């Protein structure tokens, strides 16, 4: 116990640059691309490629804004620290708790996807059973130490990256060697009703779901406190990841939508697996299902890491119970991991009660929390930059197009909320935002009242 207390509030720096780049890459190549893209293809057709380019640009601006702050002050808790320091107490409290809830929801969505992927082979296994099994395994691994997490995520991401590159190359070979038959042609990108078969409306209405795919890039900021050399590794990871994401997303979708008309894609199956299955290549379809399963587990693994570090950061700020500062001899925030796990376990119950609608509901809730998250990063960055300018400090990794880039990001967030209000099944998650902010407000007032009472005594 003495030893545990001695290490009680210290996370260990054990993540190398390769870990940080692959953690961010792994956080973004997941269910959004492999499963969420199916419903976007049905609505936007090949225009999904343009949608991912637009959302990717906004995500890059947000990453650069967070990156500028993190390089100057690499701390646990990432941007909630900046919201707290440069914006105010409630902003720090709200952004930290919102980010934690965001990744709990993402974790739930990924576990739900795991259940769907397992059903590709074993349709009789309910999604809740698969979710429960992998929930236990991944949390157990995260209770070891940060290096084990870093190595595991590194190899998870390597599998995904190699698989997507191999799929692009194999798909391109099928396309240009005529092996896949006359139905496989680049003309599928514009001949099946046009590049935007349902017009701009079809694409615009899908931007919220596309945005779901890019949630996870901010993990670069969360890793800062455990990075060996954040001044070099964070800028490198930030700049390189976005190019790779766009190549993987745009490249893979362009090849897939050339191999088979977009009209053949169904909402409940990964389009990656479906297209090769439709082409009669069951070996590749099975291999890709292993990859998409690995992808979901990889993102869930990142979520477990992220949630525990965010709770740890909130406790350091006094915005969460001090018991969450408990760190064992290996530098693992055990209490934070266990609390996050207990809440995430609700996913198993949701999949038991509503297996058909669980993924769609969780995806909508994730996007609402992500909108709050990205908007707060952008606003906190504006205040951070203003403070640094007043101090005469020149930052080492400045964000792009400040302050116009920030304004563009905020307008994009507002547009996404309007789109969600007009989308059946998503509107409820937008109406829950003011309720959620009210709960955060009450929580903050209670925390402040408790702090004053303690001071008085």
From Swiss-Prot:
Q: Which domain of life is it from?
A: Bacteria
Q: Where are the transmembrane segments?
A: 21-41, 43-63, 87-107, 118-138, 156-176, 202-222, 241-261, 272-292, 334-354, 359-379, 401-421, 426-446
Question: Could you confirm whether the keyword Hydrolase appears in this record?
Answer: no
In terms of Gene3D superfamilies, this protein maps to:
Amino acid/polyamine transporter I (1.20.1740.10)
Q: Give the record's GO CC terms.
A: plasma membrane
Segments on the Periplasmic side according to the record's topology features: 42, 108-117, 177-201, 262-271, 355-358, 422-425
Q: Which InterPro entries match?
A: AA-permease/SLC12A_dom, Amino_acid_permease_CS
Matches recorded under Pfam families: AA_permease
Gene Ontology process terms (BP)? amino acid transport; transmembrane transport
Q: How does it sit in the membrane?
A: Multi-pass membrane protein
Subcellular compartments:
Cell inner membrane
Which residues are connected by disulfide bridges in this protein?
A: none
Which PROSITE patterns would you find in this protein's record?
AMINO_ACID_PERMEASE_1
Those parts of the protein on the Cytoplasmic side are 1-20, 64-86, 139-155, 223-240, 293-333, 380-400, 447-457
Reaction(s) catalysed (UniProt annotation): L-phenylalanine(in) + H(+)(in) = L-phenylalanine(out) + H(+)(out); L-tryptophan(in) + H(+)(in) = L-tryptophan(out) + H(+)(out); L-tyrosine(in) + H(+)(in) = L-tyrosine(out) + H(+)(out)
Q: Which UniProt keywords apply?
A: Amino-acid transport, Cell inner membrane, Cell membrane, Membrane, Transmembrane, Transmembrane helix, Transport
Q: Its family?
A: Belongs to the amino acid-polyamine-organocation (APC) superfamily. Amino acid transporter (AAT) (TC 2.A.3.1) family.
Q: What biological function has been recorded for the protein in this entry?
A: Permease that is involved in the active transport across the cytoplasmic membrane of all three aromatic amino acids, phenylalanine, tyrosine and tryptophan.
| Identification of the protein by name | Aromatic amino acid transport protein AroP
The organism's lineage is: Bacteria, Pseudomonadati, Pseudomonadota, Gammaproteobacteria, Enterobacterales
